[in-house]
Design a protein with these regions (language model features):
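Residue-level preference for beta-strand/loop junctions
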Residues: 3, 16-18, 77, 131
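Glycine-rich phosphate/pyrophosphate-binding beta-alpha loops
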Residues: 34-48, 89-91, 120
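Short helix-capping and hinge/turn segments at secondary-structure transitions, especially at repeat
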Residues: 29, 42-45, 54-57, 61-69, ...
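Peripheral (often C-terminal) accessory segments that flank ATP-dependent C-N-forming ligase machineries
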Residues: 62-174
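Conserved catalytic motifs of the protein kinase core domain
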Residues: 6, 29, 33, 80
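Conserved metal-phosphate-binding beta-hairpin within the catalytic cores
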Residues: 12-42
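Single conserved hydrophobic/aromatic residue that forms the stacking wall/gate
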Residues: 1-7, 11
């Protein structure tokens, strides 16, 4: 059973150039489309950007110009994983302004990048939480097990008593 949406009817009449993010859920009856957005997905983009060796800007310009077929993208063959650190209480009520420390040590884990989402520097220059999903700890590894170990090793170095993360990221694929 297929359904159409008002947005899909608009897309049938227009040429779309840009990013299209599809949120999917795998069910016992196969994949189901939950949502689609004209933007990059979060945290899906973090793992893609970690693996992308090519400069992203020329690809985005080519996409807008309609010449994306002329761009060659070079990808790192490593596995990648992103563990989101969120404020306690998220997605319901959560506190802003809580202190986050240890990112310098965490960022030194091999193959790891820390992406900021809901952070800011307060007047004293200290990093604080300013949203629900706050950090995306993203790691590469020769396989998913190694990437997962690196990401959680980095998470464990972050001192943020008012934050949490899921500890099951990647387990189905491993």
């Amino acid at each position: 059973h297929r359904r159409s949406s008002a947005a899909s009817d608009v897309y049938k009449r227009q040429i779309y150039r840009g990013v299209l993010y599809a949120g999917l859920m795998i069910t016992e009856n196969g994949p189901k489309l939950i949502e689609y957005n004209a933007r990059f997905g979060d945290p899906e983009t973090q793992v893609l950007l970690m693996r992308l060796k090519t400069d992203l800007l020329p690809a985005l310009i080519a996409c807008a110009d309609g010449t994306l077929d002329q761009i060659n993208l070079d990808w790192d063959r490593s596995a990648a994983i992103c563990v989101v650190m969120a404020a306690n209480g998220y997605p319901a009520e959560y506190k802003k302004g809580t202190s986050i420390k240890g990112l310098q040590k965490a960022g030194k884990i091999e193959g790891t990048q820390i992406f900021h989402a809901g952070t800011l520097l307060n007047q004293q220059g200290d990093l604080i939480a300013n949203g629900g999903r706050v950090l995306g700890i993203t790691s590469l590894g020769e396989d998913l097990t190694m990437a997962q170990k690196r990401a959680y090793a980095a998470v464990d170095l972050i001192d943020w008593t008012d934050g949490f993360c899921r500890r099951d990221i990647g387990w189905r694929a491993i």
